């Protein structure tokens, strides 16, 4: 079962919660409220999305968490983003089919001046059992409080959570930019993207192996940007992936 997590310290979460209307309260667990949007549990959390540390509560209500969050960037522009969280070298469990379905639903609803992107794995929380997907609106106060933008996110999410998930080749990306250049492959339904190991982190065999393991489904394809992954680590990573039966696509 899916779980939507809204954080009262986050402006996009607050706008999202308001747009959902009156949600029946199911129960209270400490400082968490568990409400319901039709058949989907909605966990209301008082802190920041990146500070969420109540995975034990999530385990009792579902398996796949979707965090509603604001997006910030150095050069702000209107954008919808999707990504799996993780503070390297550890990461959360990634759900490639879910994350890519949400990306497609958002991109299909784009309107000017917004764009859409799939981001590299970054920031906490790091989940151990529950898959985590961040869905974000960026990148300034104007967009965070924009009811049309947040409503677009809500519509896209409802479409995905209330429909059977399409399943395309599960893939991870190694050594790409923060805003992955592989997004178009996901939009064309050639792959479903899980973890993206960005070029700016220390890319070690151990970190890649952890990311490979922490997916809801076995990864069938790894897209590796060889210029951004230096030897001897690159050779060890390639061997590890091939030993596990993962198809490797080299770029750059």
Swiss-Prot record:
Cofactor binding, note field: Binds 2 Zn(2+) ions per subunit.
Biological processes annotated in GO: D-amino acid catabolic process
Keywords: Hydrolase, Metal-binding, Zinc
Catalytic reactions on record: a D-aminoacyl-tRNA + H2O = a tRNA + a D-alpha-amino acid + H(+); glycyl-tRNA(Ala) + H2O = tRNA(Ala) + glycine + H(+)
One MF term in the entry's GO annotations: D-aminoacyl-tRNA deacylase activity
Domain of life: Archaea
E.C. no: 3.1.1.96
UniProt enzyme class: hydrolase
Cofactor: Zn(2+)
SUPFAM superfamilies: AF0625-like
Assembly and interaction partners: Monomer.
Protein's recorded name: D-aminoacyl-tRNA deacylase
Organism field: Pyrobaculum arsenaticum (strain DSM 13514 / JCM 11321 / PZ6)
